[in-house]
Amino acid sequence: MSFLYNRLSKKELKKRMFSEVEPRLTLSFYKYFTIKNTQEYRDKIYKNFYKYNILGRIYIATEGINAQISIPKKYYFFIKKFLYHLNSELNNLRINKSLNNEKSFWVLSVKIREKIVQDGITESFFNPNNVGVYIKSKTVNSMLDNKEIIFIDMRNSYEYAIGHFENAIEIKSTTFREQLKNIIPLMSYAKNKKIVMYCTGGIRCEKATAWMRFNGFKNIYHLEGGIIGYVHDARKNGLPILFKGKNFVFDNRMSEKISDEIISYCKQCGQLSDTYVNCQYNLCHLLFIQCANCSVNFKNCCSLNCMKKSSSCCL
Protein backbone atom coordinates (compact mmCIF):
# COMPACT_ATOMS: atom_id res chain seq x y z
CA MET A 1 0.00 0.00 0.00
CA SER A 2 1.33 3.45 -0.89
CA PHE A 3 0.76 6.76 0.89
CA LEU A 4 1.10 10.40 -0.08
CA TYR A 5 2.52 11.57 3.25
CA ASN A 6 4.69 10.18 6.03
CA ARG A 7 2.76 8.36 8.75
CA LEU A 8 5.52 7.60 11.27
CA SER A 9 7.36 9.83 13.74
CA LYS A 10 10.90 10.98 12.98
CA LYS A 11 12.07 9.03 16.03
CA GLU A 12 10.60 5.80 14.66
CA LEU A 13 12.01 6.45 11.19
CA LYS A 14 15.48 7.18 12.59
CA LYS A 15 15.43 3.96 14.60
CA ARG A 16 14.38 2.02 11.52
CA MET A 17 17.16 3.56 9.42
CA PHE A 18 19.92 2.78 11.92
CA SER A 19 18.78 -0.84 12.22
CA GLU A 20 18.95 -1.23 8.45
CA VAL A 21 21.92 -3.18 7.06
CA GLU A 22 21.20 -2.83 3.35
CA PRO A 23 23.83 -0.66 1.58
CA ARG A 24 22.62 2.76 0.45
CA LEU A 25 23.72 5.58 -1.82
CA THR A 26 23.18 9.28 -1.20
CA LEU A 27 22.38 11.05 -4.46
CA SER A 28 21.57 14.59 -5.53
CA PHE A 29 20.19 15.95 -8.77
CA TYR A 30 18.38 18.95 -10.17
CA LYS A 31 16.92 20.12 -13.45
CA TYR A 32 15.41 23.39 -14.60
CA PHE A 33 12.49 22.62 -16.90
CA THR A 34 8.80 23.52 -17.00
CA ILE A 35 6.44 21.46 -14.83
CA LYS A 36 2.80 22.33 -15.44
CA ASN A 37 1.10 20.08 -12.88
CA THR A 38 3.32 20.21 -9.80
CA GLN A 39 0.84 18.34 -7.58
CA GLU A 40 0.68 15.41 -9.99
CA TYR A 41 4.50 15.29 -10.12
CA ARG A 42 4.74 15.51 -6.37
CA ASP A 43 2.31 12.65 -5.73
CA LYS A 44 3.81 10.38 -8.39
CA ILE A 45 7.30 10.86 -6.94
CA TYR A 46 6.14 10.26 -3.37
CA LYS A 47 4.25 7.06 -4.24
CA ASN A 48 7.18 5.54 -6.13
CA PHE A 49 9.87 6.62 -3.68
CA TYR A 50 7.82 5.33 -0.75
CA LYS A 51 7.36 1.99 -2.50
CA TYR A 52 11.11 1.53 -2.97
CA ASN A 53 12.17 2.85 0.46
CA ILE A 54 13.79 5.95 -1.00
CA LEU A 55 14.23 8.73 1.55
CA GLY A 56 15.28 12.35 1.33
CA ARG A 57 14.18 15.86 0.48
CA ILE A 58 12.69 16.75 -2.91
CA TYR A 59 11.42 20.15 -4.03
CA ILE A 60 9.06 20.50 -7.00
CA ALA A 61 8.28 23.85 -8.65
CA THR A 62 7.02 25.03 -12.01
CA GLU A 63 10.68 25.76 -12.83
CA GLY A 64 11.92 22.21 -12.15
CA ILE A 65 13.08 19.70 -9.54
CA ASN A 66 15.76 19.69 -6.82
CA ALA A 67 16.46 16.49 -4.88
CA GLN A 68 18.79 15.01 -2.28
CA ILE A 69 17.94 11.37 -1.60
CA SER A 70 19.12 8.18 0.08
CA ILE A 71 18.34 5.02 -1.88
CA PRO A 72 18.96 1.30 -1.46
CA LYS A 73 21.97 0.70 -3.70
CA LYS A 74 20.14 -1.95 -5.72
CA TYR A 75 17.62 0.66 -6.95
CA TYR A 76 20.12 3.04 -8.56
CA PHE A 77 19.14 2.09 -12.11
CA PHE A 78 15.46 2.12 -11.17
CA ILE A 79 15.83 5.78 -10.20
CA LYS A 80 17.32 6.70 -13.57
CA LYS A 81 14.59 4.80 -15.43
CA PHE A 82 11.80 6.24 -13.28
CA LEU A 83 12.97 9.83 -13.76
CA TYR A 84 13.19 9.41 -17.53
CA HIS A 85 9.64 8.03 -17.65
CA LEU A 86 8.51 10.88 -15.42
CA ASN A 87 9.63 13.35 -18.09
CA SER A 88 11.90 13.00 -21.11
CA GLU A 89 13.57 16.28 -20.02
CA LEU A 90 15.18 14.16 -17.30
CA ASN A 91 16.93 11.86 -19.76
CA ASN A 92 20.72 12.02 -19.28
CA LEU A 93 20.14 13.85 -16.00
CA ARG A 94 23.35 14.43 -14.08
CA ILE A 95 23.13 12.53 -10.78
CA ASN A 96 25.79 13.31 -8.18
CA LYS A 97 26.82 10.45 -5.91
CA SER A 98 27.90 11.58 -2.45
CA LEU A 99 31.53 11.33 -1.36
CA ASN A 100 30.56 8.97 1.46
CA ASN A 101 27.56 6.75 2.06
CA GLU A 102 26.88 7.26 5.73
CA LYS A 103 23.20 7.37 6.70
CA SER A 104 21.98 10.73 5.43
CA PHE A 105 18.16 10.74 5.55
CA TRP A 106 15.47 8.82 7.40
CA VAL A 107 12.42 10.82 6.29
CA LEU A 108 10.86 11.15 2.83
CA SER A 109 9.74 14.72 2.18
CA VAL A 110 8.41 15.83 -1.22
CA LYS A 111 7.27 19.47 -1.22
CA ILE A 112 5.89 21.89 -3.77
CA ARG A 113 7.72 25.22 -3.72
CA GLU A 114 7.45 28.49 -5.62
CA LYS A 115 11.04 27.92 -6.78
CA ILE A 116 13.48 25.03 -6.36
CA VAL A 117 16.06 27.56 -5.13
CA GLN A 118 14.86 30.75 -3.46
CA ASP A 119 16.70 33.44 -5.43
CA GLY A 120 14.70 36.66 -5.00
CA ILE A 121 14.91 37.36 -8.75
CA THR A 122 11.78 39.14 -9.99
CA GLU A 123 12.88 40.36 -13.44
CA SER A 124 10.46 38.76 -15.91
CA PHE A 125 12.96 38.76 -18.78
CA PHE A 126 15.77 37.08 -16.81
CA ASN A 127 16.84 33.90 -18.65
CA PRO A 128 17.94 31.19 -16.17
CA ASN A 129 19.23 29.03 -19.03
CA ASN A 130 21.88 31.56 -20.08
CA VAL A 131 24.40 29.96 -17.73
CA GLY A 132 28.17 30.13 -17.48
CA VAL A 133 30.65 27.78 -19.13
CA TYR A 134 30.92 24.38 -17.40
CA ILE A 135 34.45 23.34 -16.42
CA LYS A 136 35.86 20.11 -14.96
CA SER A 137 38.66 19.34 -12.52
CA LYS A 138 41.63 19.66 -14.91
CA THR A 139 40.54 23.13 -16.03
CA VAL A 140 39.63 24.12 -12.48
CA ASN A 141 43.10 23.22 -11.19
CA SER A 142 44.73 25.11 -14.04
CA MET A 143 42.60 28.20 -13.42
CA LEU A 144 43.36 28.10 -9.69
CA ASP A 145 47.03 28.64 -10.59
CA ASN A 146 46.16 31.85 -12.44
CA LYS A 147 45.98 34.74 -9.97
CA GLU A 148 44.11 36.85 -12.53
CA ILE A 149 41.12 34.50 -12.39
CA ILE A 150 38.61 35.07 -9.58
CA PHE A 151 36.95 32.18 -7.76
CA ILE A 152 33.66 32.91 -5.99
CA ASP A 153 32.07 30.57 -3.43
CA MET A 154 28.27 30.70 -3.83
CA ARG A 155 27.47 28.91 -0.58
CA ASN A 156 26.40 30.27 2.78
CA SER A 157 29.01 31.52 5.24
CA TYR A 158 28.66 28.47 7.50
CA GLU A 159 29.38 26.22 4.49
CA TYR A 160 32.42 28.25 3.48
CA ALA A 161 33.81 28.16 7.02
CA ILE A 162 34.73 24.46 7.06
CA GLY A 163 35.94 24.11 3.47
CA HIS A 164 36.66 26.06 0.28
CA PHE A 165 39.16 26.60 -2.50
CA GLU A 166 42.13 28.68 -1.39
CA ASN A 167 41.64 32.43 -2.00
CA ALA A 168 38.03 31.93 -3.13
CA ILE A 169 35.91 35.00 -2.39
CA GLU A 170 33.18 34.50 0.19
CA ILE A 171 29.96 36.41 -0.49
CA LYS A 172 29.05 36.65 3.18
CA SER A 173 25.43 35.75 3.79
CA THR A 174 23.08 33.22 5.32
CA THR A 175 20.85 32.90 2.23
CA PHE A 176 21.34 32.50 -1.51
CA ARG A 177 18.80 35.28 -2.11
CA GLU A 178 20.99 37.68 -0.12
CA GLN A 179 24.09 36.62 -2.05
CA LEU A 180 22.51 37.37 -5.43
CA LYS A 181 21.42 40.77 -4.17
CA ASN A 182 24.93 41.67 -2.97
CA ILE A 183 27.19 40.06 -5.55
CA ILE A 184 26.61 42.48 -8.46
CA PRO A 185 27.76 45.68 -6.68
CA LEU A 186 30.43 43.77 -4.76
CA MET A 187 32.03 42.34 -7.92
CA SER A 188 31.44 45.35 -10.23
CA TYR A 189 35.20 45.96 -10.41
CA ALA A 190 35.67 42.55 -12.10
CA LYS A 191 33.22 42.75 -15.02
CA ASN A 192 35.99 42.14 -17.54
CA LYS A 193 37.79 39.42 -15.59
CA LYS A 194 37.35 35.66 -15.76
CA ILE A 195 35.18 34.51 -12.86
CA VAL A 196 34.72 30.91 -11.69
CA MET A 197 31.72 30.20 -9.45
CA TYR A 198 31.07 27.06 -7.43
CA CYS A 199 28.65 25.58 -4.91
CA THR A 200 27.93 22.13 -3.45
CA GLY A 201 26.35 20.31 -6.39
CA GLY A 202 25.85 22.99 -9.03
CA ILE A 203 22.23 24.08 -8.65
CA ARG A 204 22.91 27.48 -7.09
CA CYS A 205 25.52 28.29 -9.73
CA GLU A 206 23.03 27.62 -12.52
CA LYS A 207 21.12 30.66 -11.28
CA ALA A 208 24.16 32.61 -10.09
CA THR A 209 26.10 32.41 -13.36
CA ALA A 210 22.98 33.30 -15.37
CA TRP A 211 22.39 36.24 -13.01
CA MET A 212 25.97 37.46 -13.48
CA ARG A 213 25.64 37.26 -17.27
CA PHE A 214 22.27 39.03 -17.09
CA ASN A 215 24.07 41.86 -15.28
CA GLY A 216 26.81 42.27 -17.88
CA PHE A 217 29.55 39.90 -16.71
CA LYS A 218 30.86 38.09 -19.80
CA ASN A 219 33.55 35.61 -18.74
CA ILE A 220 31.65 33.42 -16.31
CA TYR A 221 32.46 29.77 -15.57
CA HIS A 222 31.23 27.24 -13.07
CA LEU A 223 32.22 23.81 -11.79
CA GLU A 224 30.24 21.06 -13.48
CA GLY A 225 28.51 19.14 -10.70
CA GLY A 226 29.78 21.57 -8.08
CA ILE A 227 32.31 20.55 -5.43
CA ILE A 228 31.00 16.97 -5.45
CA GLY A 229 31.42 16.70 -9.22
CA TYR A 230 34.89 18.26 -9.03
CA VAL A 231 36.12 15.74 -6.44
CA HIS A 232 34.72 12.73 -8.32
CA ASP A 233 36.23 13.93 -11.61
CA ALA A 234 39.64 14.66 -10.04
CA ARG A 235 39.76 11.22 -8.42
CA LYS A 236 38.68 9.52 -11.63
CA ASN A 237 41.49 11.22 -13.56
CA GLY A 238 44.17 10.97 -10.89
CA LEU A 239 44.39 14.74 -10.40
CA PRO A 240 45.24 16.58 -7.18
CA ILE A 241 42.22 17.80 -5.22
CA LEU A 242 42.76 21.46 -4.39
CA PHE A 243 39.64 21.97 -2.29
CA LYS A 244 40.63 22.35 1.36
CA GLY A 245 38.64 21.03 4.30
CA LYS A 246 35.14 19.61 4.36
CA ASN A 247 32.13 19.97 2.09
CA PHE A 248 29.02 20.98 4.05
CA VAL A 249 25.93 18.93 3.15
CA PHE A 250 22.27 19.52 4.00
CA ASP A 251 21.45 16.18 5.56
CA ASN A 252 22.14 14.31 8.78
CA ARG A 253 25.81 13.79 7.91
CA MET A 254 26.41 17.57 8.06
CA SER A 255 29.64 17.31 6.04
CA GLU A 256 31.88 15.19 3.84
CA LYS A 257 35.64 15.11 4.41
CA ILE A 258 37.60 16.07 1.29
CA SER A 259 41.07 16.90 2.59
CA ASP A 260 42.90 16.45 5.90
CA GLU A 261 43.23 20.18 6.49
CA ILE A 262 41.11 21.69 9.24
CA ILE A 263 40.54 25.36 8.43
CA SER A 264 37.82 26.34 10.92
CA TYR A 265 37.65 26.88 14.66
CA CYS A 266 35.57 25.87 17.66
CA LYS A 267 33.07 28.62 18.53
CA GLN A 268 33.77 28.23 22.25
CA CYS A 269 37.51 27.75 22.74
CA GLY A 270 38.97 28.78 19.39
CA GLN A 271 40.82 25.52 18.78
CA LEU A 272 40.92 24.03 15.30
CA SER A 273 37.73 22.07 14.66
CA ASP A 274 35.47 21.29 11.71
CA THR A 275 32.59 19.50 13.41
CA TYR A 276 29.17 21.13 13.11
CA VAL A 277 26.51 20.37 15.71
CA ASN A 278 23.13 21.78 16.69
CA CYS A 279 22.78 23.15 20.19
CA GLN A 280 21.32 20.47 22.46
CA TYR A 281 18.83 22.97 23.90
CA ASN A 282 15.91 22.51 21.51
CA LEU A 283 14.58 26.06 21.81
CA CYS A 284 17.97 27.28 20.55
CA HIS A 285 19.15 24.55 18.14
CA LEU A 286 21.92 26.85 16.85
CA LEU A 287 24.18 25.35 14.20
CA PHE A 288 27.80 25.91 15.26
CA ILE A 289 31.30 24.41 15.25
CA GLN A 290 32.29 22.61 18.45
CA CYS A 291 35.41 20.61 19.33
CA ALA A 292 35.31 17.33 21.27
CA ASN A 293 36.43 18.93 24.56
CA CYS A 294 33.81 21.67 24.45
CA SER A 295 31.17 19.12 23.50
CA VAL A 296 31.83 17.47 26.88
CA ASN A 297 32.29 20.70 28.86
CA PHE A 298 29.14 22.34 27.47
CA LYS A 299 27.11 19.11 27.17
CA ASN A 300 26.63 19.67 23.42
CA CYS A 301 25.21 23.16 23.99
CA CYS A 302 26.37 26.43 22.43
CA SER A 303 26.65 28.36 25.71
CA LEU A 304 26.50 28.04 29.49
CA ASN A 305 23.06 29.65 29.38
CA CYS A 306 21.71 27.01 26.99
CA MET A 307 23.42 24.25 28.98
CA LYS A 308 21.62 25.38 32.16
CA LYS A 309 18.28 25.63 30.34
CA SER A 310 18.76 22.25 28.71
CA SER A 311 19.58 20.64 32.07
CA SER A 312 16.53 22.20 33.75
CA CYS A 313 14.29 20.85 30.96
CA CYS A 314 15.44 17.33 31.76
CA LEU A 315 14.62 17.53 35.49
Please report, for each region that a protein language model flagged, where it lies by residue.
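Rhodanese-like catalytic fold shared by cysteine-dependent sulfurtransferases
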Residues: 2-133, 156-194, 203-315
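Substrate-contacting helices/loops that form the catalytic groove of nucleic-acid
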Residues: 200
